[in-house]
């Protein structure tokens, strides 16, 4: 243990006083920033596509018809039960094994054979399974009183979902959705395994040329921490803005009668 401390102290002294690490940082920082941009594209595009895919999956999942809920059940079970790395390899290496896929013309040459699009496809499929389960739970957690009020007003089922249930469910899943996006950000490092120059891919390239593994992994870790902090702040602001009416309702009820606020909270729990 003492030898490890001594070696780390020597490395830290060399790192802080030597010029070589800082010169290497300055030389490869533009490539790392390009990798940051690619990582952000992966997370943003996959997060949006996965969110859109999750809505019909969640609606089918809560259906009483076996013909509708069997497919999303199997889909969610597969993508939640297998490693993301395996899913990336299945999309990038697996699709090329089928001649019918290779004969798709520009769809093959421009999309399905490119690591960038294969990574987006794999991440979108993976995150849609998790978000679909979040949506399913949120839809079932919408207070029954709100749905019953809409039914008493004669609002159609489609408009109930469009104007009441889905918007309410989105507010419920926002914190969990933010966590899912952050997990996807950290999982995006696996995209470098299919030759994509995201942040981790650019970091590995810099290490291969400079042999400064610890220094560049530390820098990559700091950049991932910065991206995570930005996402946390963004989703916190989004949650406060989107659910502002809920906080305002609780405050207004408490001013009238504290028992009304307690009753409102009990209805939400139910």
Predicted regions and their residues:
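Transmembrane alpha-helices and adjacent helix-loop boundaries
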Residues: 1-270
């Amino acid at each position: 243990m003492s030898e490890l401390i001594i070696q780390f102290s020597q490395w830290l002294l060399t790192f802080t006083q030597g010029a070589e690490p800082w010169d290497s940082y300055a030389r490869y920082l533009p490539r790392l920033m390009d990798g940051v941009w690619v990582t952000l594209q992966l997370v943003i595009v996959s997060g949006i596509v996965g969110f859109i895919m999750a809505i019909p999956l969640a609606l089918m999942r809560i259906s009483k018809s076996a013909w509708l809920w069997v497919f999303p059940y199997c889909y969610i079970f597969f993508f939640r039960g297998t490693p993301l790395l395996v899913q990336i390899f299945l999309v990038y290496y697996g699709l090329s094994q089928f001649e019918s896929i290779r004969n798709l013309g520009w769809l093959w040459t421009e999309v399905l054979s490119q690591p960038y699009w294969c990574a987006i496809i794999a991440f979108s499929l993976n995150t849609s399974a998790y978000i679909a389960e979040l949506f399913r739970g949120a839809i079932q957690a919408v207070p029954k009183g709100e749905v019953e009020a809409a039914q008493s007003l004669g609002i159609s089922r489609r408009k109930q979902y469009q104007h009441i249930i889905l918007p309410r469910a989105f507010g419920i899943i926002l914190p969990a959705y933010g966590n899912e996006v952050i997990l996807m950000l950290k999982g995006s490092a696996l995209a470098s395994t299919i030759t994509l120059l995201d942040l981790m891919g650019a970091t590995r390239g810099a290490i291969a040329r400079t042999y400064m593994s610890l220094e560049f992994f530390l820098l990559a870790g700091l950049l991932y921490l910065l991206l995570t902090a930005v996402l946390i702040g963004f989703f916190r602001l989004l949650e406060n803005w989107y659910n502002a009416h809920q906080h305002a309702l609780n405050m207004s009820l408490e001013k009238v009668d504290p028992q009304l606020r307690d009753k409102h909270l009990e209805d939400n729990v139910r």
